[in-house]
């Protein structure tokens, strides 16, 4: 420390003496992460003189060295008295730290040897003024976890290289937590795990299976797409080792998400799918009742896997070709399972997501998902993230084209996840890293990355020719032995297994494939989880369901959720809202939207049905209407009345989400597909922003049941309505959802009264059918004086897919019927009343899909004589329901009647940006709909 900039400053500062140790610790934190210290201290440390001063060593290591040295009387005089030795000791500790920080840059990670990183100067002893003459000198090793307090420099250097520059490259010094860093150091510096002969033979057998399946498929179905794992074969022993280790650590469920690369191999060699079933899929055979189906490398699978610690249930999530989107779906599924156990931080459920090197750094949903990893409503106790890093994305292999970071896994540093790079040609290193990563996740409940550095033996798919764009890489690959061959040769040299043993493994596996039965010894038939979905099969949208709540109980619930303890100091406007709700409960006021919605949740949790509501502002509601969560104005605490109904109630969980649409909606889809007993709701801040999650809507929500047989009762609340707020705050793009509707795949509703939203939400939870519900929820109607409902309408009513004329018009005098949905109804109603018109009836369609033909025919029955029908909408002609639903409108109006459009003209933008233009357009469309010539 004689040359330390910090020491020079302390010697000339009044901040010394008793404060010196504290300041040294603060400076050590600054060296690790400048942002971790207060801005004033950071500014002070940054101003320390740098000229002629070598990089500072962590002072705790130096202090520890001298502390140990002082206790060693036999060496005290000879060591302490030599100032040169003291300086070199500090340099040795600097060298150790350099390997911890940057040793991974010299690690032997690339099986092909093509990936050459720049030399790191501070890994060379000479950088620290240490020469070969010092190699035989003995130095204290500080906190280096070798099991020794002192080592010769040459021995220490070799240990550092083996630890940090071998087939494993560890990145963890970016982590702020000292405890986590020391835990990792202890595990990796204390020596690699040793494996017995049986374990090594098992690794060889699993590599044999990985290679054997790919070769078998290549021979049996030449040219067919299978997205081979070859080159990354170590994924199979990695996954099986992780499942075994997880089972021994108390895990009872593992949920996997992965893309196409190696998926068929995982299905057969990990989850135990019968090879014959896979062969049938290659041959084009399929079961007729499974809907449209999907390609084989998108299909999911479930099974049980026997470990020494007990059975582990495995679930591989279904996924589309859209890379990385399955990751938040998996996390949502895991959170649902943990909530079912009521153990949100339990190790009983393990999420494993498998990524590609190009996709993990290229797809923004990865960042969104990582950002959720420690958020209260979304955390799952950490995810093990495996990157199959075959160093090429389709045809892009130059890192300068693929990313802007040295490693594809650098994104993991945003959540301070440790990153373990490992050479996929070394299955023992892979197994060591697998156990290490899982133990870290289980210990610290954090995400962890494994970068499985490998290669892709064939093209992106088997019909592709990769040498056109990667000539040098594929010249090397053609000459490179397979991972199985490399490891078989190694075990022969170790006299663990002969080449004859290895050949026998190959033959036995091929025979097992010929037989077509399960090839996974640990596979067991599923004996749990199968009950979950049976009550929800074979239901229709319009079937009867138990909907009634006794008036007395409804009043009790309304009173309970509007009563707040005196200790909770409410904000004045919130107090006014809760006062109004007490009046609603007493029958003194009609229910507004927020009151009816909250009461719907209360009735459900009262019956033991859990409710999960999430969105960017869901606790309060974007438009200040819900206030399910009350914020105490005196101390900042929160109170949720819906969580205080009675002890045996269903859980009510409301979460203000991270600012994301894509990952959060995918998470909620995963949650809903894993837990049908919960009413799962995602609310967009504005419906306009939901298209940030369009891939989730297109690939999962609208089509998941037809492609994969996956039912989902997710509710999407999308605030929608034209109120002059411009093109980004007016439209939830109703037309896009209607365009996706077919085969009764989902429901699209536009409720217009508090009673309707009350019954709609209850119907979604109580009815047996589990299909997505897309709701064009209101904004201005939340406080509209006409958009109110009585307690009797809540108690005795039901959801009406169509609502007829409410004013007392003489049907015989009606010349025109205007059909509409949503807020525009009230504009039409008020204008008609203002005009004192009696010749125009207004009919609301509250459910646009599945279209309520029967209900509409009943509503229109009294207008059978009318020949003039109008569809009125706020949206432009090319948007809204007109184009997608007019064939339904025509089907329910009387034969021979005409149908005309009243609404905004076609527009490239959803809405105008000028209030005056908006108001004129709105008045024009209302007048157009009502004016009878």
From Swiss-Prot:
Record note on what altering residue 313 to A does: Mild reduction in growth in presence of acetate or glucose as sole source of carbon
Catalytic activity line of the entry: N(6)-[(R)-lipoyl]-L-lysyl-[protein] + 2-oxoglutarate + H(+) = N(6)-[(R)-S(8)-succinyldihydrolipoyl]-L-lysyl-[protein] + CO2
Cellular component annotations (GO), alphabetically ordered: cytoplasm; cytosol; oxoglutarate dehydrogenase complex
GO molecular function: identical protein binding; magnesium ion binding; nucleotide binding; oxoglutarate dehydrogenase (succinyl-transferring) activity; thiamine pyrophosphate binding
Any single GO BP term: tricarboxylic acid cycle
Cross-referenced SMART domains: Transket_pyr
Alphabetic keyword roster: Nucleotide-binding, Oxidoreductase, Phosphoprotein, Thiamine pyrophosphate, Tricarboxylic acid cycle
Keyword Nucleotidyltransferase in record: no
CDD domains with a match to the protein in the record: TPP_E1_OGDC_like
EC class name: oxidoreductase
Gene3D superfamilies assigned: 3.40.50.12470, 3.40.50.970, Multifunctional 2-oxoglutarate metabolism enzyme, C-terminal domain, TPP helical domain
One Pfam family cited in the UniProt record for this chain: OxoGdeHyase_C
Listed cofactors: thiamine diphosphate
Additional facts recorded: Binds AMP; however it is not clear if the binding is physiologically relevant.
Main function: E1 component of the 2-oxoglutarate dehydrogenase (OGDH) complex which catalyzes the decarboxylation of 2-oxoglutarate, the first step in the conversion of 2-oxoglutarate to succinyl-CoA and CO(2).
Family: Belongs to the alpha-ketoglutarate dehydrogenase family.
Protein name stated in the entry: 2-oxoglutarate dehydrogenase E1 component
Record organism: Escherichia coli (strain K12)
Name of the coding gene: sucA
């Amino acid at each position: 420390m004689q040359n330390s900039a910090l020491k020079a400053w302390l010697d000339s500062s009044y901040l010394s003496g008793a404060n010196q140790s504290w300041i040294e610790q603060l400076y050590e934190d600054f060296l690790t992460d400048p942002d971790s210290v207060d801005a004033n201290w950071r500014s002070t440390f940054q101003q320390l003189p740098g000229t002629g001063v070598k990089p500072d060593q962590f002072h705790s290591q130096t202090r520890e060295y001298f502390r140990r040295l002082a206790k060693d009387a036999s060496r005290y005089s000879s060591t302490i008295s030599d100032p040169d030795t003291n300086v070199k000791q500090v340099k040795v500790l600097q060298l150790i730290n350099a390997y911890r920080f940057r040793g991974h840059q010299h690690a032997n990670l690339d099986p092909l040897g093509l990936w050459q990183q720049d030399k790191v100067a501070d890994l060379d002893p000479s950088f620290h003024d240490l020469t070969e003459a010092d190699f035989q000198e003995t130095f204290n090793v500080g906190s280096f976890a070798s099991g020794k307090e002192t080592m010769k420099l040459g021995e220490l250097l070799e240990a550092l290289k083996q630890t940090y520059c071998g087939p494993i490259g560890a990145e963890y010094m970016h982590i702020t937590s000292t405890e986590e860093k020391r835990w990792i150091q202890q595990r990796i510096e204390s020596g690699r795990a040793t494996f017995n002969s049986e374990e090594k033979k098992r690794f060889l057998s699993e590599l044999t299976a990985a290679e054997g399946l790919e070769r078998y498929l290549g021979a049996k179905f030449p040219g067919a797409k299978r997205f081979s794992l070859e080159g990354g074969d170590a994924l199979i022993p990695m996954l099986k080792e992780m499942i075994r280790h997880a089972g021994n650590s108390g895990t009872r469920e593992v949920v996997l998400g992965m893309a196409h690369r190696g998926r068929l191999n995982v299905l057969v060699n990990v989850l135990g799918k019968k090879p014959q079933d896979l062969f049938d899929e290659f041959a084009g055979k399929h079961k007729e009742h499974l809907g449209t189906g999907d390609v084989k490398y998108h299909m999911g699978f479930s099974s049980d896997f026997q470990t020494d610690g007990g059975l582990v249930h495995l679930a591989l999530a279904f996924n589309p070709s859209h890379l990385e989107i399955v990751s938040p779906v998996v996390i949502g599924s895991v959170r649902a399972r943990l909530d079912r156990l009521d153990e949100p931080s339990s190790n009983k459920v393990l999420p494993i997501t498998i990524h590609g090197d190009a996709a993990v750094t290229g797809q923004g949903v990865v960042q969104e998902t990582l950002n959720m990893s420690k958020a209260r409503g979304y955390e799952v106790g950490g995810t093990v993230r495996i990157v199959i890093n075959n160093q090429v994305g389709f045809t892009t292999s130059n890192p300068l084209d693929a990313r802007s970071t040295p490693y594809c896994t650098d994104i993991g540093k945003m959540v301070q996840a440790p990153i373990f790079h490992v050479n996929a040609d070394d299955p023992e290193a892979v197994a060591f890293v697998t156990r290490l990563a899982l133990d870290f996740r289980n210990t610290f409940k954090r995400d962890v990355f494994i970068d499985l550095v490998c290669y892709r033996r064939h093209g992106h798919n088997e019909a592709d020719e990769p040498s056109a764009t990667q000539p040098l890489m594929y010249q090397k690959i053609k000459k490179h032995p397979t991972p199985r061959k490399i490891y078989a040769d190694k075990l022969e040299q170790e006299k663990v297994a002969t080449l004859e043993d290895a050949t026998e493994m190959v033959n036995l596996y091929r025979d097992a494939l010929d037989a077509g039965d399960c090839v996974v010894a640990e596979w067991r038939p599923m004996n749990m989880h199968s009950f979950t979905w049976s009550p929800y099969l074979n239901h229709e949208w319009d079937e009867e369901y138990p909907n009634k709540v006794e008036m007395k109980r409804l009043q009790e619930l309304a009173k309970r959720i509007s009563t707040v303890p005196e200790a909770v100091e409410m904000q004045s406007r919130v107090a006014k809202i809760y006062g109004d709700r007490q009046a609603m409960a007493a029958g003194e006021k009609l229910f507004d939207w927020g009151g009816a919605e909250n009461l719907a949740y209360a009735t459900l949790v009262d019956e033991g049905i859990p409710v999960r509501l999430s969105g960017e502002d869901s606790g309060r509601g974007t438009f200040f209407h819900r206030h399910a969560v009350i914020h105490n104005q005196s101390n900042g605490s929160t109170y949720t009345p819906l969580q205080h109904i009675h002890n045996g109630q269903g859980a009510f969980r409301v979460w203000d989400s991270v600012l994301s649409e894509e990952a959060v909606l995918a998470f909620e889809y995963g949650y809903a597909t894993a837990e049908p007993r919960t009413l799962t709701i995602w609310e967009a801040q504005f419906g306009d922003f939901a298209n940030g999650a369009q891939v989730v809507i297109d690939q999962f929500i609208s089509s998941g049941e037809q492609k994969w047989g996956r039912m989902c009762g997710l509710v999407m609340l999308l605030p929608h309505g034209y109120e002059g707020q411009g093109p980004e705050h007016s439209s939830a793009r109703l037309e896009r959802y209607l365009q996706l509707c077919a085969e009764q795949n989902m429901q699209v509703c536009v409720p217009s009264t508090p009673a309707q939203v009350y019954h709609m939400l209850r119907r979604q939870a109580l009815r047996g059918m589990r299909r997505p519900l897309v709701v064009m929820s209101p904004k201005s109607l939340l406080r509209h004086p006409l958009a109110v409902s009585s307690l009797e309408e809540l108690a005795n009513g039901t959801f009406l897919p169509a609502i007829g004329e409410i004013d007392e018009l003489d049907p015989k005098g009606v010349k025109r019927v205007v059909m509409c949905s949503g807020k525009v109804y009230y504009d039409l109603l008020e204008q008609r009343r203002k005009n004192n018109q009696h010749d125009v009836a207004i009919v609301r369609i509250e459910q646009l899909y599945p279209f309520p033909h029967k209900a509409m025919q009943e509503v229109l029955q009294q207008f059978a004589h009318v020949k003039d029908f109008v569809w009125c909408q706020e949206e432009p002609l090319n948007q809204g329901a007109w184009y997608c639903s007019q064939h339904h409108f025509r089907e329910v109006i009387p034969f021979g009647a005409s149908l005309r459009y009243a609404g905004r003209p076609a527009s490239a933008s959803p809405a105008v940006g000028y209030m005056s233009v908006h108001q004129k357009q709105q008045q024009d469309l209302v007048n157009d709909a009502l004016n009878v010539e």
